[in-house]
A protein has these predicted regions:
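DUTPase catalytic domain/fold
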Residues: 1-145
């Protein structure tokens, strides 16, 4: 396990938890004073009441909850969202409603999950030529159905 410091921005905020021993993500909950309705085909920025600190060897990814996606067409808009190790502000989640019905978020609702992920930094080396591959410049759909 890797230590992550977490700060509740209000005493009423509930800390994220792993729901099972095999879960890779902790559920994030909305921390809002009043319910938020997300209209179809729109998004809303949902606060969690939490801020965190962790090693620069990691990032935290914010990902959708599969149950919200399959049951309500709700997802995290910028999936995965990235929380950098040097960010100290409140974690907020952009929730998007792909569905045709309003979606109501209440205080304490589980809205997304956060996963701690290792970061491998790149060292760029500029070149005028790249090695050849069989695929070459074949892009979208080039490898088949």
């Amino acid at each position: 396990m890797v230590k992550v410091l977490i700060k509740k921005l209000s005493p009423q905020v509930k800390l994220p938890l792993y729901k099972t021993s095999g879960a890779s993500g902790m559920d994030l909950m909305a921390y809002i004073k009043s319910s938020i309705t997300i209209k179809p085909k729109t998004s809303s920025l949902i606060p969690t009441g939490l801020s965190i600190a962790f090693s620069e060897d990691f990032e935290i990814q914010i990902r959708p909850r599969s149950g919200l996606a399959v049951k309500h067409d709700i997802t995290v808009l910028n999936t995965p969202g990235t929380i950098d190790s040097d960010y100290r502000g409140e974690i907020k989640v952009i929730i998007y409603n792909h569905g045709n019905n309003d979606f109501l978020i209440n205080n304490g609702d589980r809205i997304a999950q956060m996963i701690l992920t290792p970061v491998i930094k790149m060292e760029l080396q500029e070149t005028s030529d790249l090695p050849e591959t069989i695929r070459g410049e074949g892009g979208f759909g080039s490898t088949g159905k």
